[in-house]
From Swiss-Prot:
This is Thioredoxin reductase. Disulfide bonds join C133-C136. Its EC number is 1.8.1.9. GO terms for cellular component: cytoplasm. The active site is a redox-active disulfide bond. The gene is trxB. It comes from the Bacteria. Pfam families: Pyr_redox_2. The lineage of its organism: Bacteria, Pseudomonadati, Campylobacterota, Epsilonproteobacteria, Campylobacterales. It comes from Helicobacter pylori (strain J99 / ATCC 700824). Binds 1 FAD per subunit. The keyword RNA-binding does not apply. Belongs to the class-II pyridine nucleotide-disulfide oxidoreductase family. It catalyses: [thioredoxin]-dithiol + NADP(+) = [thioredoxin]-disulfide + NADPH + H(+). It is found in: Cytoplasm.
Length: 311
């Protein structure tokens, strides 16, 4: 039987594996179908991880993690997981190929991904001017003009954040009304650096080999079209958490989740199910930063060590 099963191989999962194995967990297994690394491997530049002074790509950044985290005995099972369920005091893990595993404890570190819009040019310029993380990429646009797309809390909050760095922020939303907290909207409207463009949609993201150069936008009320010259577009139209592994045969969820499907945990990354932990972007209130996901993974592993000692 597996002592600790880790579902997901991003920064949270890898950190959990490192801390679990170094902490004496004899049989720790990481379940990740492909090479571990997580969605950060798709990032073109990382410069906000403490201790890493050079600007590196996400792929280069995560490569040493794999080597270090497997050095202490973490095993890698290259298979996708379909479902995790509880059977008595242990867990049953069903892989997509039908194979089953049993584990004393489980850390869910499956992460999530920002929703995409399908706008023409979005895929082409993803990571080359199109971003979903103002904290990660905002600094690259210091004293430049950028656009933010979205009408919820995250979009408006990130527009305010970017206004502290950028020369100007265009906040684009398809409706006149916003879904964010009124006080947040008020702060944005009182910020002279933020210009509201409503009701507008982005029809195309344009650019060249160096990245985004402009946006084609259209007013949905008047059909007026205009070109917005900006080197960056930040998209905040929602976030999908990868919680499918929690869904049971009767369609219930293995543990408590919030309205968005994120796993409810306490400060030690424990869920409401004994022996089940969660770390990284899958958990509630996740800051969605690599350094935070790594911290979560370490915390979850320490909680697992304590759990295994007493069970």
């Amino acid at each position: 039987m597996i002592d600790c099963a880790i579902i997901g191989g991003g920064p949270a999962g890898l950190s959990a594996g490192l801390y679990a194995t170094r902490g004496g967990v004899k049989n720790a297994v990481l379940f990740e179908k492909g090479m571990p690394g997580g969605q950060i491997t798709g990032s073109s530049e990382i410069e906000n991880y403490p201790g890493v002074k050079e600007v590196v790509s996400g792929l280069d950044f995560m490569q040493p993690w794999q080597e270090q985290c497997f050095r202490f005995g973490l095993k890698h099972e290259m298979t996708a997981i379909q479902r995790v369920s509880k059977k008595g005091s242990h867990f049953v893990i069903l892989a997509e190929d039908g194979k089953t595993f049993e584990a004393k404890s489980v850390i869910i570190a499956t992460g999530g991904s920002p929703k995409r819009t399908g706008i023409k040019g979005e895929s082409e310029y993803w990571g080359k001017g199109v971003s979903t993380c103002a904290t990660c990429d905002g600094f690259f646009y210091k004293n430049k003009e950028v656009a933010v797309l979205g009408g919820g809390d995250t979009a408006v909050e990130e527009a305010i954040y970017l206004a502290n760095i950028c020369k100007k922020v265009y906040l684009i939303h398809r409706r006149d009304g916003f879904r964010c907290a009124p006080i947040t909207l008020e702060h944005a409207k009182n910020n002279s650096k933020i210009e509201f463009l409503t009701p507008y949609v982005v029809e195309e993201i344009k650019g060249d080999a160096s990245g985004v150069s402009s946006l084609s936008i259209k007013n949905t009320a008047t059909n007026e079209k205009r070109e917005l010259v900006v080197p960056g577009l930040f998209i905040f139209v929602g976030y999908d958490v990868n919680n499918a592994v929690l869904k049971q045969e009767d369609n219930s969820m293995l543990c408590e989740c919030d309205e968005y499907g994120s796993i409810v945990v306490d400060f030690s990354m424990k869920t409401n199910v004994q022996g089940l932990f969660a770390a990284g972007d899958i958990r509630i209130f996740a800051p969605k930063q690599v350094v935070c996901a790594a911290s979560d993974g370490a915390t979850a592993a320490l909680s697992v060590i304590s759990y295994l000692e007493h069970h």
